[in-house]
Amino acid sequence: MTASIAQQKIRIRLKAFDRRMLDLSCDKIIQTADTTSASAIGPIPLPTKRKIYCVLRSPHVDKDSREHFETRTHRRIIDIYSPSAKTIDALMKLDLPSGVDIEVKL
């Protein structure tokens, strides 16, 4: 089973609203991969998604008075080549902030 895992690639996609929290999570993942002798490539930054919301300021009339809010979703990809079972266990036990969304593909 270890031989089949060693030939695979793990792709980790990270998403967060806060860029600093995302970068800290990427650093933890890369550091964990390096300590278990797996080669990590990344973090590769993907385009930031901007979602703009337009809200009327007044509850009644005044359609001309509007306010804009936006959310920015920052994304990164990390590829881990030649992972061992030890690497996968270390990544599963890794404690990351709750504001970071993680998708793992083998």
UniProtKB/Swiss-Prot annotation:
Q: Which GO terms describe its cellular component?
A: ribonucleoprotein complex; ribosome
List the Gene3D superfamilies: Ribosomal protein S10 domain
Function text: Involved in the binding of tRNA to the ribosomes.
Record's family? Belongs to the universal ribosomal protein uS10 family.
Q: Which GO terms describe its biological process?
A: translation
Which Pfam family is one of those matched by this entry?
A: Ribosomal_S10
Q: Which GO terms describe its molecular function?
A: structural constituent of ribosome; tRNA binding
Q: Which UniProt keywords apply?
A: Ribonucleoprotein, Ribosomal protein
What is the designated name of this protein?
Small ribosomal subunit protein uS10
What species is this protein from? Prochlorococcus marinus (strain MIT 9301)
Question: What PROSITE patterns has UniProt attached to this entry?
Answer: RIBOSOMAL_S10 (PS00361)
Q: Subunit arrangement?
A: Part of the 30S ribosomal subunit.
